[in-house]
Amino acid sequence: DVKPDINKAKVRYGTVNKEYGFRLATTAPADDGPIWMVNLMSYRAKADYADGREAEYSGKEADDRYAPLGPLKAIGAQPVFLADVDTQFLNDTPKWDRVGIVKYPSRRAFIEMQSRPDFQELHHHKEAGMAETIVAGCLPMELPPLPADAPSWADVPHPPTAADPYVVVVHVIKFKDDDRRDEMATYTDHAAKIA
């Protein structure tokens, strides 16, 4: 059984929210369950290893070497979405290069993975590649149903094709305060009708 030490958690590409990490690590098994970790990633132009080794590849290439698929599989986690950012439609900063979402079987599994030797063997590549990242623990919301008269792909002016496929829009929202969450539900309902 791997016992992570949240107080030792430190990375060069962001600030670990130790309070949140502690909550994840100590969630009672009866209250724990799947969690989706959304990763917003911004890369260094050139990989920068902490041990001083010279790297002749980009931060993105270093992150590709990190890709912890083995440790994820070992704990029962699975990547469910991975995409390079084509265009950042709103706000220029921070600039995100890639978005990834991983479904973990539990909060505890996410925290305990950080201490696994097979994960730690790869992590220096992430440290070298990332300029900045945000990792947010998320739980899916129930999507509003599509209206009965929603058009099919065949009925829209520019349907997706093999040469010009559909676009996935990732909309990350930061609330000013918790009292505004009801407004977000209203926005989501209206956006679903328009989309």
Regions found by a protein language model. Name each.
Residues Y49, P105-H124:
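Short amphipathic alpha-helices within nucleic acid-binding modules
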Residues L122-C138:
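Conserved short beta-strand edge segments in small beta-sheet-based binding/regulatory domains
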